[in-house]
């Protein structure tokens, strides 16, 4: 016999999956058809789920949809299992189609594999940070020179975090400028604006968004209520990159990632 917890979880999962698939509320009769649980029993669990703030109704006469909190928990659980899996993208047009079909904003930028190889002193006038494929140039200061020596062997993201922590503003700005030059692809900027509905949306348009991601999955306060963003490690046209995917919590990111993997 199915336990009440199992039934409740099963009903909630069915509501989530149906909404992701059809973007439409689901009622007790449809759940009964999908799950073979009596409609009267389903109504009891719908009341419990509603009381717990896990589902809601857009209108009194309509079916149920998952709440924003439910979707946040759903994507958190999903991403814990998926975030370390490899993603390969072989053409830009495929990303453009995905952005349009799923109404997501997409930003692809390089620099993931950049590691500080050497710190050079140019006549005590400039300091050159050599990342092998890229370089940064700073004004020479003895204190900065000594500090930067300790960063040799670290990747660009780690150096950026340290620079932010110690308020090394010149270095932070140089890294931001470098990241701008490393943008490989961007699509659906209109969606970026829709997420914020104000001038805040510009932070999604450049690589400074990278440092706002404390984790690879972010909700509020980085994104407005009801929206989210994923920062994905990937290969894009053979280059190590990060990809930002941003959109509604009701967007099917599971399907998006599946499409990407199938196209690889």
Swiss-Prot record:
Origin species: Campylobacter jejuni subsp. jejuni serotype O:2 (strain ATCC 700819 / NCTC 11168)
Function: Negative regulator of class I heat shock genes (grpE-dnaK-dnaJ and groELS operons). Prevents heat-shock induction of these operons.
UniProt similarity note: Belongs to the HrcA family.
UniProt record, GO biological process: negative regulation of DNA-templated transcription
Encoding gene (name): hrcA
Protein name per the record: Heat-inducible transcription repressor HrcA
Stored NCBIfam families: PRK03911.1
Keyword Lipoprotein set for record: no
Molecular functions per Gene Ontology: DNA binding
Keyword vocabulary terms for this entry: Repressor, Stress response, Transcription, Transcription regulation
Keyword Signal: no
InterPro entries, per database record: HrcA, WH-like_DNA-bd_sf, WH_DNA-bd_sf
């Amino acid at each position: 016999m199915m336990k009440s917890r199992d039934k409740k979880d099963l009903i909630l999962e069915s509501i989530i999956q149906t909404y992701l698939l059809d973007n439409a509320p689901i009622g007790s009769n449809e759940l009964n058809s999908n799950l073979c649980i009596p409609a009267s029993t389903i109504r009891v669990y719908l009341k419990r789920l509603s009381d717990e703030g896990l589902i809601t109704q857009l209108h009194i006469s309509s079916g149920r949809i998952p709440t924003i909190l439910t979707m946040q928990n759903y994507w958190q659980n999903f991403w814990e299992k998926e975030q370390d899996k490899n993603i390969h993208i072989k053409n830009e047009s495929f990303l453009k189609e995905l952005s349009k079909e799923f109404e997501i904003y997409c930003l692809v930028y390089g620099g993931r594999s950049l590691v500080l190889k050497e710190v050079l002193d140019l006549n005590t006038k400039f300091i050159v940070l050599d990342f092998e494929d890229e370089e940064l140039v700073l004004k020479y200061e003895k204190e900065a020179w000594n500090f930067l020596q300790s960063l040799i062997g670290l990747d660009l993201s780690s150096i950026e975090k340290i620079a932010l922590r110690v308020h090394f503003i010149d270095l932070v700005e140089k890294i931001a400028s470098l990241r701008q030059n490393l943008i490989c692809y961007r699509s659906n900027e209109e969606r970026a604006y829709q997420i914020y509905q104000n001038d805040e949306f510009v932070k999604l348009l450049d690589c400074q968004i990278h440092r706002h991601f404390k984790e690879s999955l972010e909700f509020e306060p980085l994104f407005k209520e009801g929206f989210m963003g994923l920062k994905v490690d990937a290969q894009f046209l053979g280059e190590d990159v990060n990809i930002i995917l941003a959109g509604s919590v009701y967007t099917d990111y599971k399907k998006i990632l599946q499409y990407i993997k199938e196209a690889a």
